[in-house]
Amino acid sequence: MYNKHHKTLKLHIKKGDTVQVLSGNYRKKQGTVLKVFPKTYRAIVEGVHIVSKHKKPTAKNPQGTIEKVEAPIHISNLMLIESATSRPTRIGRKLDEEGKLQRYSKKTGEFIKNG
């Protein structure tokens, strides 16, 4: 899964992107990326992959609780939603007019604004 000697790849998903889940129990569900974990190739998506987390009793909460939280999902199961068309698109990278490497939509060819 994670090898500390292996170089991590650039990911097509960034924090703040709107994505759609491609496979699994949450297939076709959309959400915003809350956090990305590049070393393990996973991301937390808002409203997707909800799990129950058991909290121990504390002085503040002597009963203890069961909370519903989002768990990470593998990046290969996510596809970026293009803001212009609201449809999933594949991502590529190419140089823009300023010579900077930018993400672009392979469907429309337009550059994707970061963040």
Curated annotation (Swiss-Prot):
Please name the GO terms that the record assigns under molecular function: rRNA binding; structural constituent of ribosome
The domain of life is: Bacteria
InterPro entries, from UniProt?
KOW (IPR005824), Rib_uL2_dom2 (IPR014722), Ribosomal_uL24 (IPR003256), Ribosomal_uL24_CS (IPR005825), Ribosomal_uL24_KOW (IPR041988), Translation_prot_SH3-like_sf (IPR008991)
Q: A GO term (biological process) for this protein? A: translation
- What keywords sit in the KW lines? Ribonucleoprotein, Ribosomal protein, RNA-binding, rRNA-binding
One Pfam family of this protein, by short name? ribosomal_L24
Q: What GO CC terms are in its UniProt record? A: ribonucleoprotein complex; ribosome
Q: How does it assemble?
A: Part of the 50S ribosomal subunit.
Q: What does this protein do?
A: One of two assembly initiator proteins, it binds directly to the 5'-end of the 23S rRNA, where it nucleates assembly of the 50S subunit.
**Cited HAMAP family:** Ribosomal_uL24_B (MF_01326_B)
**What does the similarity note say?**
Belongs to the universal ribosomal protein uL24 family.
**The protein, known as:** Large ribosomal subunit protein uL24
| Species | Amoebophilus asiaticus (strain 5a2)
What gene does the UniProt entry assign to this protein? rplX
